[in-house]
From Swiss-Prot:
Keywords: Amidation, Amphibian defense peptide, Antibiotic, Antimicrobial, Secreted
Leucine amide: residues carrying this PTM: L13
Subcellular location: Secreted
The protein, known as: Temporin-1Cd
Length: 13
């Protein structure tokens, strides 16, 4: 899982 994707998920969730 890519770090930038994790950041986006954190913002969405």
């Amino acid at each position: 899982f890519l770090p930038f994707l994790a950041s986006l998920l954190s913002k969405v969730l």
